[in-house]
Each structure stands twice: as structure tokens, then as C-alpha cells.
């Protein structure tokens, strides 16, 4: 099983340092590029091919009629061998009108960074976008993850790790609760805060909405196991996958 976990550690430190220089209000408005991956296993499509036409149709459609109310859409176009599957997910506090700008940015960013790739993923601060020639609905992606961490450490690392992990685990249970609904739809997102000594930790967890609640918890459980590798004693950190992610900081980073 391959993974890109940890492959952007240098980028992580630079990105976090830049983010920390912004005010809280500015952070809430940023949509920084974080990472991307172009699939080498799915190959490339030819210009003017049926796959390209299907992809163009889907990408132009999702930016105009996407389900921005809940910040998620999974759609497909075409027939085998030219099937195109596209998924986008906006951050839990970036639904409705806050979602379309991120998706539009992601579409142009993915085209520029992974030209003609049949499979690709791009992450921004407020959304992710995935294109593929392979169906992935309700399937956890275990192969594509990475982390960003604050280069600065807490003084009491042991206590901080224990309490932050407990907060994230609590949020994972809440996000994947089958009774955590918006109407009839699973929310698959939770945010919270906790005081640890003199500091307050703010955190969130989220799954993509193609997952059922049991798959959501399974995904979150998997990335939370990477907390020691990502975030041991760090003042802030996040682990991103395609199917789920978590983040914590010592400052508010979510919209109300």
C-alpha cells in the first residue's frame, strides 16, 4: 500500500508559518492551496477523446449546479471505458455560498497541475476535488494522505497529546453518529474546543458524504492513529485524506 503521508513536511512548516501570521478573521477567508496528487496508475486521456468530453461536462456542471447546501457532490458521466467520476467536498463551515469559489479554484488548479491525468486529487484549505476513471463511492481511500504540522512544540507534550487526542476522538464519534443529521442526511462533520492548562484547543473532523456512518468512523479512526507521526506535541496539526481529515489549532480557524 503506497502513501504520500509525510511527503510534504517541509511545505507543511512553511505553510503553517505563513498561516500563523494572518489574523483569525483573515484565516477564515483564506483558501490556500495545500497539496495535490496526480495518479500514475490511471494513465492519461487524449485531447478530443470521449473521456475528455465527459470530464469537461462534469467539471463545468459542478461549478454551476453543485449541491452547495451541504458542500458535497459525487457524480459520474459516460460509459466504460470512458467513465468519469468526480467528487468534491467543502469544509464543514464552508457550505452554501462559501463553497463555489473554492470548487472553481480547485477545478482550475487541478487542470493546471495534473493536465490530462485520468485520476487526480487536489486539496485546498476549504475544499478538496477528486477526479477518477474508477468508482469510489462509499469506499475509503487509504492510499492518499498527508499532513501539515506547526513546527513549534508545546512545553507539556504528554498532557497536550493525551487531551488533544481525546478531543479528536470525541469529535470522531460525534461526526459519525448515525443520529447526527441535517434533515435526513448524515452530517459527518464535528467541531469543538477544549481547555488544556492555560491554552484552548480548537478542532474539527470531517468525512466525505459518500461514506456511511460506520465507514466514516473507520476512516477517522485510521487517520487519528497517525496523530503521533503528524502532531506529537505540535501546537497545531492536520491530517488529510481523500475520505476524511482532522485539524486542531490553538486559535479559532472555523467560521461560526
UniProtKB/Swiss-Prot annotation:
This is Cysteine-rich repeat secretory protein 42. Residues 1-26 form the signal peptide. It is found in: Secreted. Pfam families: Stress-antifung (PF01657). Belongs to the cysteine-rich repeat secretory protein family. Gene3D superfamilies: Gnk2 domain, C-X8-C-X2-C motif. Keywords: Repeat, Secreted, Signal. One of its GO terms (cellular component) is extracellular region. Residues 33-136, 142-253 form the Gnk2-homologous domain.
